[in-house]
Amino acid sequence: MKKTCVVSVFLVLLLLKFHDLSMGEEISPLKKVAPREQIFPCPGFPCPKGYFCDKGSQKCREGTD
């Protein structure tokens, strides 16, 4: 009985993993850190709070103008 429960739990976790992968989600205990330089083009996209538009690279960068 105990072995059946353990195997059942393992199979459920395995199915959930494949479901997440099929949905395009990564399974990782580590969170991704936002890059210091955002790839948003400044002319067509407003920079988030705490970022400014770098005129040279046309990208949002962390800091103040």
From Swiss-Prot:
It is found in: Secreted. GO terms for molecular function: potassium channel regulator activity; toxin activity. Keywords: Disulfide bond, Ion channel impairing toxin, Potassium channel impairing toxin, Secreted, Signal, Toxin, Voltage-gated potassium channel impairing toxin. Expressed by the venom gland. Residues 25-36 form a propeptide. GO terms for cellular component: extracellular region. Its main location: secreted. Disulfide bonds join C42-C53, C47-C60. Residues 1-24 form the signal peptide. Belongs to the scoloptoxin-04 family. Voltage-gated potassium channel inhibitor. This is Kappa-scoloptoxin(04)-Ssd1a. The lineage of its organism: Eukaryota, Metazoa, Ecdysozoa, Arthropoda, Myriapoda.
